[in-house]
């Protein structure tokens, strides 16, 4: 007669699998911290063309190629009149 601890056949193999996992436990994706790669949030957006990347914002808020609307001639004249 067969042992009760190790039954025979395919059903026995299924029941007798060891409970300890032979590989380290993998953390589920919900516990992983979100990726900080810069591309992760920009997927699906078209790439900037070279023309857009060359246009660059200055400190006064004007982009490259725009003329300032307020002429600064008065300030230069005042500076030149100082002794």
UniProtKB/Swiss-Prot annotation:
Compositional bias (Acidic residues): 63-83
GO annotation terms (biological process): symbiont-mediated arrest of host cell cycle during G2/M transition
Entry keywords, A to Z: Early protein, Host cytoplasm, Host G2/M cell cycle arrest by virus, Host nucleus, Host-virus interaction, Modulation of host cell cycle by virus, Phosphoprotein
Region annotated Disordered, chain positions: 1-83
GO CC, any one term: host cell cytoplasm
Record localization: Host cytoplasm; Host nucleus
Keyword Phosphoprotein set for record: yes
Compositionally biased tracts (Basic and acidic residues): 42-58
Keyword Phosphoprotein in annotation: yes
Record note on modification: Phosphorylated by host ERK. The phosphorylation triggers a structural change that enhances keratin binding and protein stability.
Composition bias, Low complexity: 28-40
Protein function: Contributes to multiple aspects of the viral life cycle including viral genome amplification, suppression of suprabasal cell differentiation and egress of newly formed virions. Induces host cell cycle arrest at the G2 phase by associating with and preventing the nuclear entry of host CDK1/cyclin B1 complexes. Inhibits cellular DNA replication by preventing loading of host replication licensing proteins MCM2 and MCM7 onto chromatin. Within the cytoplasm, associates with host kinase SRPK1, a splicing factor regulator, and inhibits its activity.
Note: The major E4 form is first synthesized as an E1^E4 fusion protein from spliced E1^E4 transcripts, such that the first few amino acids of the E4 protein are derived from the N terminus of E1.
Binding partners and assembly: Assembles into oligomeric complexes. Interacts with host CDK1. Interacts with host SRPK1; this interaction may favor expression of late viral transcripts. Interacts with host cytokeratin components KRT8 and KRT18.
UniProt family annotation: Belongs to the papillomaviridae E4 protein family.
Protein name: Protein E4
UniProt source species: Human papillomavirus type 1
């Amino acid at each position: 007669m067969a042992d009760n601890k190790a039954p025979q056949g395919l059903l026995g193999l299924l029941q007798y699998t060891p409970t300890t996992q032979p590989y380290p436990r993998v953390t589920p994706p919900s516990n992983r911290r979100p990726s900080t790669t810069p591309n992760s949030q920009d997927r699906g957006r078209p790439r900037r063309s070279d023309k857009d990347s060359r246009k660059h914002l200055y400190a006064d808020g004007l982009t490259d190629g725009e003329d300032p609307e307020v002429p600064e001639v008065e300030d230069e004249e005042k500076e030149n009149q100082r002794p």
